[in-house]
Swiss-Prot record:
<feature type="binding site">
    <location>
        <position position="166"/>
    </location>
    <ligand>
        <name>Ca(2+)</name>
    </ligand>
</feature>
<comment type="similarity">
    <text>Belongs to the polysaccharide lyase 1 family.</text>
</comment>
<feature type="region of interest" description="Disordered">
    <location>
        <begin position="185"/>
        <end position="206"/>
    </location>
</feature>
<dbReference type="Pfam" id="PF00544">
    <property type="entry name" value="Pectate_lyase_4"/>
</dbReference>
<comment type="pathway">
    <text>Glycan metabolism; pectin degradation; 2-dehydro-3-deoxy-D-gluconate from pectin: step 2/5.</text>
</comment>
<protein>
    <recommendedName>
        <fullName>Pectate lyase</fullName>
        <ecNumber>4.2.2.2</ecNumber>
    </recommendedName>
</protein>
<keyword id="KW-0732">Signal</keyword>
<dbReference type="InterPro" id="IPR045032">
    <property type="entry name" value="PEL"/>
</dbReference>
<dbReference type="InterPro" id="IPR011050">
    <property type="entry name" value="Pectin_lyase_fold/virulence"/>
</dbReference>
<comment type="function">
    <text>Plays a role in bacterial invasion of plants.</text>
</comment>
<feature type="signal peptide">
    <location>
        <begin position="1"/>
        <end position="26"/>
    </location>
</feature>
<keyword id="KW-0106">Calcium</keyword>
<dbReference type="GO" id="GO:0046872">
    <property type="term" value="F:metal ion binding"/>
</dbReference>
<dbReference type="GO" id="GO:0005576">
    <property type="term" value="C:extracellular region"/>
</dbReference>
<keyword id="KW-0479">Metal-binding</keyword>
<keyword id="KW-0964">Secreted</keyword>
<dbReference type="InterPro" id="IPR012334">
    <property type="entry name" value="Pectin_lyas_fold"/>
</dbReference>
């Protein structure tokens, strides 16, 4: 018999329909995506229709893994996370392969994963989404720390250390909604790792990547904090066969705080970025700002009323950095309190097919600081 960690009382099945509707409207675990690209292609519903028997409350790594692997009906599952879960269960990872075998958490189709406490957090683990129709809400993800970084002498002019595993990877999946999720290096910031071969020894990879034909993704009211290479949308210039016409992603009302680069870095995708707040400095000792939007091969970025408070930056070339792209459109954004002016060809060739509500740029910072991230749902 498959374990169930939390089910609704049997009597609840017999309450009046009006009460059921009232409860459903008030329960964030039952909500579906209402903004951005995740509303397209039939919408993103996750486990919003899960049977009571397929609703789990988990407090440990073992319970979380069991809930993710459980056999459920066609309406999917809801997994409610309570408190801080250490996926390593107190046993440090010794190698990259050891980390992969114990830390990876695959999220199946029609799943809603939601934190139900203000401190709901995943540590020493990472999520992988290769299945369609997934919702992740109201949790903190401490970016994974690879114990075995690899030196690449050909990475950059002086070589670099590289590591594996992102906090969340969306690979080939369609219809994914990430809402009120905080990504952070947390307890292991990059200044703690020392140097080798004359370069900082980097134990982190990305925070969140969307790649290999993934599509119809919305990131809303989330927070990315204290990280170097943040969000990659499209993983390779040579992936046109899988990525062209896909990688449709919306990021809105989201905080990027002390992020060095890739906020996001885009290839191929029609990516809509609106009402986001970026704050940082080129002189930050741990996470110096390099660029925000990486304009890569065949990318089609629409940036709209974003706010960039970045000390040390005075022009668009550091906001929209050229990584082989040819078009980029910005409308109404602010850089350090002044209108952002870019010289890019703005003919991106598409407009958002969904309706959305825009804040004026002067209201973005206050809105995002008050509402974005885990614990603010």
């Amino acid at each position: 018999m498959k374990p169930k960690f939390s089910t609704a009382a049997a009597a609840s099945l017999f309450v009046g329909s009006l009460l059921v509707v009232g409860v459903a409207c008030a329960d964030p675990a039952l909500e579906v995506a209402t903004t951005g690209w995740a509303t397209q292609n039939g919408g993103t519903k996750g486990g919003s229709k899960a049977a009571a028997a397929n609703i789990y409350t988990v407090k440990t790594a073992a319970e979380l893994k069991s809930a993710l692997k459980a056999s459920v009906g066609s309406n999917g599952r809801i997994i409610k996370i309570s408190g801080i879960i250490d996926v390593s269960e107190g046993k440090p990872y010794t190698t990259t392969s050891d980390m992969k075998s114990r830390a990876r958490l695959d999220i199946p189709t029609k799943t809603t994963l939601i934190g139900i406490t203000s401190n709901a957090e995943i540590r020493e683990g990472y999520f992988y989404v290769k299945a369609n129709d997934v919702i992740i809400r109201n949790i903190t993800i401490e970016n994974p720390w690879d114990p075995e970084p690899v030196w690449d002498p050909d990475d950059g002019s002086a070589g670099n250390w590289n590591s594996e595993y992102d906090g969340l990877t969306v690979e080939g999946a369609t219809n994914v909604w990430v809402d009120h999720v905080t990504f952070t290096d947390g307890r292991r910031t990059d200044d703690q790792n020392g140097t080798a071969n004359g370069r900082p020894k980097q134990h982190h990879d990305g925070a969140m990547d969307v790649k290999k034909g993934a599509n119809f993704v919305t990131i809303s009211y989330s927070a990315f904090k204290s990280h170097e290479k943040n969000d990659l949308i499209g993983s390779s210039d040579s992936a046109s066969s899988t990525d062209s016409g896909k990688l449709k992603v919306t990021i809105h009302n989201t905080l990027f705080e002390n992020i060095s680069a890739r906020a996001p870095r885009v290839r191929f995708g029609q990516v809509h970025l609106y009402n986001n707040y970026h704050v940082g400095s080129t002189s930050n000792k741990v996470y110096p700002f390099s660029h925000a939007h990486g304009v890569g091969k065949e990318s089609k970025i629409f940036s709209e009323r974003n706010v960039f408070d970045i000390s040390g930056v005075s022009s668009c070339d550091k906001i929209a950095a050229d990584y082989g792209g040819s078009v980029y459109r910005d409308q109404g954004s602010l850089l350090n309190g002044k209108a952002l002016t870019c010289s890019w060809n703005s003919n991106i060739g598409w407009t958002p097919p969904y309706t959305y509500s825009l804040l004026s740029a002067d209201k973005v910072a206050a809105d995002v600081k008050a509402k974005a991230g885990a614990g603010k749902l």
